[in-house]
Amino acid sequence: MFNPRSGWRAKSCTCCVPIFQVLGYHLADSFAKRPRGTPRRPGDCLTLQAKIVLLPGDGIGPEVIRQAHRVLEAVASQFGHQFEFSEHIIGGIAIDKTGEALPDATTAACKASDAILLGAVGGPKWDDPNAKTRPEAGLLKIRKELGLFANLRPIVTFEELLDSSPLKREIIEGTDILFFRELTGGLYFGPSGLEELPDGQQRAYSTAVYTTSEVERIVRMAAHAALKRRNKLTMVDKANVLEASRLWRRVSARIMKEEFPTISYDVVLVDSMAMHLLSRPTSFDVVVTSNMFGDILTDEASMLPGSLGMLPSASLGSSGPGLYEPIHGSAPDIAGKGIANPLATILAAAMLLRHSLGLEKEAATVEAAVKRVLAAGYRTADLVRRGEPSLGTVAITDHVLQSMVG
């Protein structure tokens, strides 16, 4: 891969082996954005120089980012790459230091990077509804600044953790769903406000707004992924009530009929989807939906594997750096205790390697290491029953690092 900022260096070797998807998810080549060049050539071992921005954020964010940083450094050392890391503030800590949830310096660093790894933002300290700004505003703004319109959340059950799920093994075993959540439209970005009424009451409103092009691009992206997976796409809406959902349904139907006729395509109302995720999650392959519906459904689905601490996500646009993060929150109740599960952030780092840097073998190495650690019986506190032994944040990462070279 050629990087206009620093460049690839290629050398002949025999170390490249066939690549397999350890966790069963990947992006289609047609939209896996690798803005700095072209895919690696079979038979070449290529050295990459890349700039990676770390955004630790709040709560347990700094702890899990620190461990993912260790893993990325190990990848660079093991495969001969050169990763340049820089750390910047976002969220509550940024509000405390600058008064803004996303300082200009952070935005500039992210735009100049090849990829971004985020910890978590928010916490009770900044929960004042009357505050000028909130930590979550930093996340919304960075998505907008970078043009990130698609959030990918893989929901994959690990065989080793099936008994950790609140659902029965026979319901969740084999679950492998890839959610595509639209990020730039809908209720979170439409017109909103608070009005004072003559009788002393207040009236609040939030408006869901979508354009044809916003729906088209996310549906196409999801469809390309379906072609690379099990060839099935489900679109979730509320078209029986909402006009914005009716637009989604019309546009999606046209795109699928005209451009992806070989894909098995269906639509499900959001309330039904919430039930289906708990009763028959293995029925779904790729799911595409709007901003708020995706936000809620993916949080629900995140409990299928047994813990939020196991699930990564990626936010991607048409070009430029992607943003990678665990889907769990800042968990301020355990911050600083050294017990946070870093595996979701480590898996997010693997997604970063694959989708922003084009390093498939390296990503698979990280994912395989995590899987071996779980197979060996190592667990963090969120993955065990009360009273059972568990490992801390650093210790579980130590095992991942050992497994990578073992």
Language-model regions: role of each:
Residues 13-16, 45:
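Cysteine-centered motifs
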Residues 53-70, 75-76, 199-271:
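Glycine-rich phosphate/diphosphate-binding loop of Rossmann-like nucleotide-binding domains
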Residues 58-61, 114, 180, 222, ...:
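Buried hydrophobic positions in well-ordered alpha/beta secondary-structure cores of metabolic enzymes
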Residues 80-103, 277:
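N-terminal beta-loop-helix "entrance" segment that forms/cooperates
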Residues 92-95, 278-378:
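Glycine-rich phosphate/nucleotide-binding loop
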Residues 96-205, 292-294:
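N-terminal glycine-rich phosphate/adenylate-binding segment common to multiple enzyme folds
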Residues 184-185, 189-229, 233, 239-241, ...:
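Glycine-rich phosphate/pyrophosphate-binding loop and the adjoining helix
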